[in-house]
């Protein structure tokens, strides 16, 4: 039997795609290994969001080729960098056999066979009219992912933010039918999932078909919540423009829906938001936050921020700081703006100096870290439900789980009783990125 190794970069959608690729390829006679040195087929499933993504791919490809150049191996470049770079990958890394975009991964079996027969380069970066989900059998979905599972419900993006390549690498927005999603959710729960994370590039833009109707995300969540042994539901990533009434109500009425929303704002300046083509204002964003908090007082938020977008002044940046101070995030992710070839932001002449971007990022991160630590410290002395997987902690007998607010929670579990269970935990200590607790015996 041949062996398959997949390295995944980037977002949860890529993790889900890697799981799909495993399930697609295993019937060809492959077993999955965790060591690239033992693999006959190597797939790098890439992400194009962050700076120098293409260079990181070429560097990794070079390392693999150098270490395996005397052994027969098939190398596949997959994901969003593969979509963006296309044939250029073969020019810069001629030892790569296959290039496949994220919407074409279902064609991998044919591409692998074709590459083995021709001993030449094979590429598929099409956006097929038949979506990738429609090409797959039920056997490719819902296989065991442990106690917490990913389920893709929506792909692509129609927003065209001026800093982002996703519309060009993932294509137009597409929503899977309700029944297809529900079948996969049932199968995931039957295979041990207690929590399902609903995924989409703009997950709250979901508009799936159900018996001649169009359902939004809130209605879908209420439907999935009926699955008896499913205990938790999450969704990511949402866009402020796509918030809708039934999603507000789902947070108020569905106990299984976790009280935590990742809602990227990117900037606290209306001028910069217009330049980014985000199509909402800071005032509208804050109205969304307040509406959720009124309906669900214990709800918490995380967000994404880009500092140093072209044209950002000190006043614009201060707007971001004021917004963070007002919202008080449980978590947040912040990055310096980096140009993406082919996006409108890359063409602008008013780029912010790198030194200024670095200074602003450090200022913002200091505030975000302070808020995150304070939120974590507010948990000390409380008892919270924690979902544990098989993730081990730094110390012997220690296991790590997730709180409803996505905090990492460590406890001692010498008898391995808590794995794949939701356990009530008393929080004893808190740090920047984790909590320490002890299991409360029933």
From Swiss-Prot:
Keywords associated with the record: 4Fe-4S, Cytoplasm, Iron, Iron-sulfur, Metal-binding, S-adenosyl-L-methionine, Transferase, tRNA processing
GO molecular function, one term: N6-isopentenyladenosine methylthiotransferase activity
Annotated binding of [4Fe-4S] cluster 2, by residue: 157, 161, 164
Residue stretches making up the TRAM domain: 377-441
The keyword S-adenosyl-L-methionine belongs to this UniProt entry's keyword annotation: yes
Cofactor: [4Fe-4S] cluster
Cellular component GO terms held in the UniProt record: cytosol
Cofactor note: Binds 2 [4Fe-4S] clusters. One cluster is coordinated with 3 cysteines and an exchangeable S-adenosyl-L-methionine.
Principal location listed in the UniProt entry: cytoplasm
Catalyzed reaction equations: N(6)-dimethylallyladenosine(37) in tRNA + (sulfur carrier)-SH + AH2 + 2 S-adenosyl-L-methionine = 2-methylsulfanyl-N(6)-dimethylallyladenosine(37) in tRNA + (sulfur carrier)-H + 5'-deoxyadenosine + L-methionine + A + S-adenosyl-L-homocysteine + 2 H(+)
Family the UniProt entry places it in: Belongs to the methylthiotransferase family. MiaB subfamily.
Assembly information from the UniProt record: Monomer.
Known function: Catalyzes the methylthiolation of N6-(dimethylallyl)adenosine (i(6)A), leading to the formation of 2-methylthio-N6-(dimethylallyl)adenosine (ms(2)i(6)A) at position 37 in tRNAs that read codons beginning with uridine.
Protein name, UniProt field: tRNA-2-methylthio-N(6)-dimethylallyladenosine synthase
């Amino acid at each position: 039997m041949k062996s398959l190794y997949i390295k995944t970069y980037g977002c949860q959608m890529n993790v889900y795609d890697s799981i799909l690729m495993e399930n697609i390829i295993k019937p060809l006679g492959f077993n999955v290994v965790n060591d690239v040195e033992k693999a006959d087929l190597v797939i790098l499933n890439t992400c194009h969001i962050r700076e120098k993504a293409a260079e990181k791919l070429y560097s990794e490809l070079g390392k693999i080729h150098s270490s395996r150049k005397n052994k027969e191996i098939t190398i596949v470049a997959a994901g969003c960098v593969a979509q963006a770079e296309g044939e250029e990958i073969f020019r810069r890394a001629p030892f790569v056999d296959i290039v496949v975009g994220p919407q074409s991964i279902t064609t991998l079996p044919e591409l692998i066979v074709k590459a083995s027969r021709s001993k030449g380069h094979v590429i598929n970066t099409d956006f097929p009219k038949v979506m990738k989900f429609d090409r797959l059998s039920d056997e490719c979905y819902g296989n065991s992912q442990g106690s917490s599972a990913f389920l893709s419900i929506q792909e692509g993006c129609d927003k065209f933010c001026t800093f982002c390549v996703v519309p060009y690498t993932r294509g137009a927005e597409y929503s899977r039918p309700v029944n297809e999603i529900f079948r996969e959710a049932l199968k995931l729960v039957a295979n041990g999932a207690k929590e399902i994370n609903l995924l989409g590039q703009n997950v709250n833009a979901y508009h799936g078909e159900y018996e001649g109707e169009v359902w939004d995300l809130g209605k879908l969540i209420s439907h999935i919540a009926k699955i008896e042994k499913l205990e938790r539901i999450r969704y990511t990533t949402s866009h402020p423009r796509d918030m809708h009434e039934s999603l507000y109500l789902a947070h108020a009425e569905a106990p299984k829906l976790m009280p935590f929303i990742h809602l990227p704002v990117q900037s606290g300046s209306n001028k910069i938001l217009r330049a980014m083509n985000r199509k909402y204002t800071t005032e509208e964003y804050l109205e969304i936050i307040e509406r959720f908090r009124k309906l669900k007082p214990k709800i918490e938020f995380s967000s994404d921020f880009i500092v140093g977008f072209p044209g950002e002044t000190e006043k614009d940046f201060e707007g971001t700081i004021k917004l963070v101070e007002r919202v008080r995030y449980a978590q947040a992710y912040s990055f310096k703006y980096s140009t993406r070839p082919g996006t409108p932001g890359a063409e602008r002449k008013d780029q912010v100096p790198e030194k200024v971007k670095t200074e602003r990022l450090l200022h913002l991160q200091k505030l975000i870290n302070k808020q995150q630590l304070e939120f974590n410290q507010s948990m000390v002395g409380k008892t919270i439900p924690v979902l544990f997987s098989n993730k081990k902690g730094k110390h012997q007998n220690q296991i790590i789980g997730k709180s409803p607010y996505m905090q990492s929670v460590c406890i001692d579990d010498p008898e391995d009783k808590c794995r794949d269970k939701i356990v009530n935990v008393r929080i004893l200590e808190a740090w920047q990125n984790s909590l320490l607790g002890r299991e409360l015996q029933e």
